[in-house]
Amino acid sequence: MLARAARGTGALLLRGSVQASGRVPRRASSGLPRNTVILFVPQQEAWVVERMGRFHRILEPGLNVLIPVLDRIRYVQSLKEIVINVPEQSAVTLDNVTLQIDGVLYLRIMDPYKASYGVEDPEYAVTQLAQTTMRSELGKLSLDKVFRERESLNANIVDAINQAADCWGIRCLRYEIKDIHVPPRVKESMQMQVEAERRKRATVLESEGTRESAINVAEGKKQAQILASEAEKAEQINQAAGEASAVLAKAKAKAEAIRILAGALTQHNGDAAASLTVAEQYVSAFSKLAKDSNTVLLPSNPSDVTSMVAQAMGVYGALTKAPVPGAQNSSQSRRDVQATDTSIEELGRVKLS
């Protein structure tokens, strides 16, 4: 009779706990086992036994023996990791934005005695603590930081729960925020902000592309000008080298011609040949005067070709006259002069004809 009364009292307390919390605790999901003297406790469970209404001991997994009527199983605690869905709730951020947020809580009972006698419903208590802690932590952050510092927010909630739930024999392993719902207007403003940020990035990237393009074009023009100047420089160097080679070749040819002419002048009748050449060039120069419309200076009697030739020969003779050695034959000189005069007269007759 006492056992039945005790079981009835335990069932009444359990129903009262369920009604107060509004949910069925995980630890009493399968009900309380009866005292059958010999009991087998499953793995990862802890059965709290009371003797005559006072805590007696905690049954370990395996075979256990109880005294009928005196001993009663009062609580059954699961030592497995428990997952609890934290209901959606409203919270206000630091910048006065109201959010709807929910989460998932992972916890484990570390001390069955504290979990049984420290709080009426440990799971419900931890859920309420998680909600209040989450509201408190969200009030410390602005809306932007809520999305950026999600991991740190979860860690702060876990630390706050563990500090408060230590006396309940419960340890919070982790807390994860599932969904964050913002008001429609705030969502629209956030979307506009995101679009503005994207447009800003696009503008920056476009300007950077334009700058890089301008730099590349300028660099290309610079390289083209450098190459063009180098090519022009090389062309001028080659042209100068060619002109220098041509001048040198002309100088060498002229020097060779002068050398040959000097050698020819030293031969027999060389002076006469030179005089003849000078006379030809003199007459040829005056013959071109009639063809060109130029203002020139003419001798006093341009029609007298013989006098012009004689004058040219006199100039050449004055330039080429050299002192004669004392032993030179004067008769030979006179003969040479006469021969030269004869040649000039013949040349005059040829020109006049």
Swiss-Prot record:
One of its GO terms (cellular component) is actin cytoskeleton. One of its GO terms (biological process) is stress-induced mitochondrial fusion. GO terms for molecular function: cardiolipin binding; GTPase binding; T cell receptor binding. The modification N6-succinyllysine is found at K145. CDD domains: SPFH_paraslipin. It comes from the Eukaryota. Residues 215-252 form a coiled coil. Disruption phenotype: Embryonic lethal at the preimplantation stage. T-cell-specific conditional knockout does not alter the normal development of those cells but decreases their responses to stimulation through the T-cell receptor. It is a peripheral membrane protein; Lipid-anchor. The keyword Ribosomal protein does not apply. It is found in: Cell membrane; Mitochondrion; Mitochondrion inner membrane; Mitochondrion intermembrane space. Residues 324-353 are annotated as: Disordered. Signal peptide: none annotated. Keywords: Acetylation, Cell membrane, Coiled coil, Cytoplasm, Cytoskeleton, Lipid-binding, Lipoprotein, Membrane, Mitochondrion, Mitochondrion inner membrane, Phosphoprotein, Transit peptide. The modification N6-acetyllysine is found at K145, K233. The modification Phosphoserine is found at S17, S330. It holds the Pfam family Band_7. Disulfide bonds: none annotated. Forms homooligomers. Interacts with MFN2; may form heterooligomers. Interacts with PHB1 and PHB2; recruits them to cardiolipin-enriched mitochondrial membranes and stabilizes them. Interacts with CACNA2D2. Mitochondrial protein that probably regulates the biogenesis and the activity of mitochondria. Stimulates cardiolipin biosynthesis, binds cardiolipin-enriched membranes where it recruits and stabilizes some proteins including prohibitin and may therefore act in the organization of functional microdomains in mitochondrial membranes. Through regulation of the mitochondrial function may play a role into several biological processes including cell migration, cell proliferation, T-cell activation, calcium homeostasis and cellular response to stress. This is Stomatin-like protein 2, mitochondrial. The lineage of its organism: Eukaryota, Metazoa, Chordata, Craniata, Vertebrata.
